[in-house]
Regions:
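Short, acidic (Asp/Glu-rich) active-site segment that either coordinates a divalent metal cofactor
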Residues: 180-225, 260
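Acidic/polar, glycine-rich intrinsically disordered N-terminal extensions of enzymes
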Residues: 18-45
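Residue-level detector of flexible, active-site-proximal loop/helix-junction positions
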Residues: 35, 67, 80, 157, ...
Length: 343
């Protein structure tokens, strides 16, 4: 058959062509083979509460035993334009971890235990190469790090819509559970409470429209700064341990909007504010490179990037030092970066 553009007129009967789904760009057999390839990755995440097999119309899971008044907590997110750079540089596994992290880190801010994760992947073809399999393997890794099951997902072939070779779009959905009496909602926060910042793994998954603009203008080469694509750190295990030891009053996942916009979301009422000392930690060098190459104002840097702080806790001053020591014992760097003040 002569190669044609998608919108060229074509009389199938006159040309003697029998149209099928594969000719239109979707190979059902390849899709079934892909499902078989990812089964081991998916099953490696399953918790004892998972019910049923793999590949059904839905996923089922029991609420773990021990909860008296369980409250379900849900969140959804993507990886933004970081996904485009990850595609270009073959970081498919890492972007899978990113996807889980962006959802899980949001869900745990109220004290929830992550239960299960769902993914949505849109790609031109599932059989072009191993990249979509690598992506799912990364998602499974993120789920194992989070302690949640990869309960299901959808991989859709969009041959006419995603014309760039190997490009894909992804979204994730996470559900967790928390005991109603143990919800961390910020209601106990008072002036003088301390803000502890926990190190990020670099840029994480926000600010990439600005970063990509710098790459388009040849000011930054990703090949010179591979740490730009480091996956977002997952804080679920750390937070799970800390909340058993210390009275955590509030938590924030530092994403788009940086510290100035995410920390105030912890505050329970009017009359309170956040005071941050930006000199209290050393920001990773990559942020200095971005600021210098783009001539970005400091205020803009603070509103766009995490600047090296990926997650924050608000604790009473009497447990500040012990909390910092405990975080260090888990292998993370952390600093007291500010406090709660009267507005």
């Amino acid at each position: 058959m002569t190669e044609r553009n998608w919108d060229d007129p074509l009389d199938f009967k006159e040309e003697g062509i029998e149209l099928d789904y594969k000719l239109a760009g979707v190979d059902i057999d390849a899709g079934n083979y892909f499902v078989e390839k990812i089964k081991p990755h998916v099953k490696s995440t399953h918790r004892p509460e998972v019910m049923g097999g793999f590949g059904g119309f839905n996923g089922m899971m029991r609420i773990p035993s021990g909860y008296q008044s369980p409250i379900l907590v849900s969140g959804t997110d993507g990886v933004g334009t970081k996904g485009k750079l990850a595609t270009l540089f073959g970081r498919d596994y890492d972007i899978g971890i990113d996807l889980v992290a962006m959802c899980v880190n949001d869900v745990i801010t109220c004290g929830a235990e992550p239960l299960y994760f769902l993914d949505y992947i849109s790609c031109p073809k599932v059989d072009d190469n191993k990249r979509i399999t690598e992506l799912v393997a990364g998602i499974a890794d993120g789920c194992r790090q989070s302690g949640c099951a990869l309960l299901g997902g959808e991989t859709a072939e969009h041959p006419q819509d995603l014309a760039v070779p190997n490009e894909y779009d992804i979204a994730g959905f996470c559900t967790g559970v928390v005991e109603e009496s143990e919800i961390i909602d910020g209601k106990l926060i008072n002036p003088g409470d301390k803000i502890i910042g926990i190190e990020s793994n670099g840029v994480h998954a926000n600010g990439f429209s600005l970063i990509r603009y710098l790459t388009f203008r040849h000011q930054i080469k990703v090949s010179d700064h591979p740490d730009l694509l480091n996956p977002t750190r997952i804080y679920a295990s750390l937070v799970s341990d800390l909340k058993k030891e210390f009275p955590i009053l509030g938590m924030a996942h530092i994403t788009g909007g940086g510290l100035p916009e995410n920390l105030p979301r912890c505050l329970p009422r009017k009359g309170l504010d956040i005071k941050i000392d930006y000199s209290s930690w050393k920001r990773p060098d990559i942020f200095n490179v971005i600021q210098d190459k783009g001539n970005v104002k400091e205020e803009e840097m603070r509103r766009v990037f995490n600047l090296g702080i990926g997650y924050c806790l608000i604790v009473p001053p009497e447990v500040e030092v012990d909390t910092l020591l405990a975080i260090d014992g888990h292998g993370y760097k952390s600093w007291t970066i500010g406090e709660v003040v009267l507005e």
